[in-house]
Amino acid sequence: MSELTTIARPYAKAAFDFAVEQSAVEKWHEMLAFIAEVAKDEQIQQFLTSSLSPEKVADTVISICGEHLDKSGQNLIRLMAENKRLTVLPAVFNEFRHYMEEYNAIAEVQVISAQPLNATQTDKIAAAMEKRLARKVKLNCSVDNTLIAGVIIRTDDFVIDGSSRGQLNRLANELQ
């Protein structure tokens, strides 16, 4: 687990729990998505690590975000600025998104294929994964020409390697 994730998780969990309590999960998702995009900017990253006081850094970030932050979002920014943790805002958003997907019973599934998949193939994979995971799935498809043929399916819990490259690797291991 990366250090950023370790630092970001408590902030994301607190924000998520607060959002659920306030019935504002979607609003918080949008707020954190915006803040994360702002924090990814190279100039903003340099500013966040500057020697300015935490109050000035927080006030500047809040003014940049403007209407995209409500009072609670501003409080999160102030707290993270006090603790000099504003640079992990993108990781906080990623962790929040994971909590939100878990809450909404959505599993994120990586599908890596040798060739681009058509709609029928992605529908079949989605249906099979929904059945196996007993939840809705969100497919993230990508192409890797080095697979030769087939697909690799990844979730947080397991990997299914149905690629020709994977089969060749397993065969090579058996022969050794």
Curated annotation (Swiss-Prot):
**Key word GTP-binding present:** no
Q: Which InterPro entries match?
A: ATP_synth_OSCP/delta_N_sf, ATPase_OSCP/dsu
GO MF, one annotated term: proton-transporting ATP synthase activity, rotational mechanism
Task: Spell out the subcellular localization from the entry.
Answer: Cell inner membrane
Query: Which SUPFAM superfamilies would you find in this protein's record?
Result: N-terminal domain of the delta subunit of the F1F0-ATP synthase
* Membrane topology, as annotated: Peripheral membrane protein
Query: Where would one find coiled-coil regions in this protein?
Result: none
Source organism's superkingdom?
A: Bacteria
Instruction: Please give the name of this protein.
Output: ATP synthase subunit delta
